[in-house]
Amino acid sequence: MKATLLIKNIENLYTCDKDFTILHHAFIACHHEKIIEINTGSYKEWLDPATRVIDAQGECVVPAFIDCQFKSFTHVRLGDQLRQDINALYAMRQNGILTLICDNPNSQRMKLEQDVFYKKNQPKIPVLQRLSELKNEIPETFLMSCGFGLPNSYVYSMAPISYVLFQTLRVCSRTLLESMTSLPAKEFNLSDRGSIEIGKTADLLVLQVTTIEHYFQTLGRPLIHRMIKNGIQFYPEWMVC
């Protein structure tokens, strides 16, 4: 089996597995929607003439983000609700949120660039979603949401809250990254995503920074260079494999 998509020369690959393994100068090989190899060293055995290759030199790769508390526009007419939801989901997608958990079954959808699942259970760990809710006592383990749909809250990115948590409240980068990737996947039984491991779905973000710490220290500058959903790059342009 050869790779349909291969990302090479990754400065830092944050797998978000149970040990939070970080691989340096690594590569990811994908066969259609699944990850078939992550490693360092030579990747040539995974190539054939049809393999699409992405060079991520000087960049890091993380799992695509998961927002576990999306609230749709339920207070408007159905037609307006669908239109407003589409606009909101597009804006979140531009900020790397490729999976969402929603409390409205009408908002469920699975598309090439983004999935929305109906919330069938309440999380056992707290969800941080508003800057005004942040206290000096931050729970050791938490999930993160951008808080879209709360009263007077039109935030389409988890960058503002993660910036404050990292810079002001000194929450470590591992805790932050897991709160928007592997932890929500585990909490809502999305076993096919949330980490970069062999056999998982290739939902990936390529960031224009060498470390995740740099990403959490930055506001106001788009740092997502590439987005890959189900093993296919769709941002900044489609790359058919």
How should each PLM-predicted stretch be described?
Residues 135-206:
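His/Asp/Glu-enriched, well-ordered alpha-helical/loop segment
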Residues 10, 28, 33, 58, ...:
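Divalent metal-coordination and catalytic microenvironments
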Residues 1-47, 212-214, 232:
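N-terminal metal-binding scaffold of metallo-dependent hydrolase/deaminase domains
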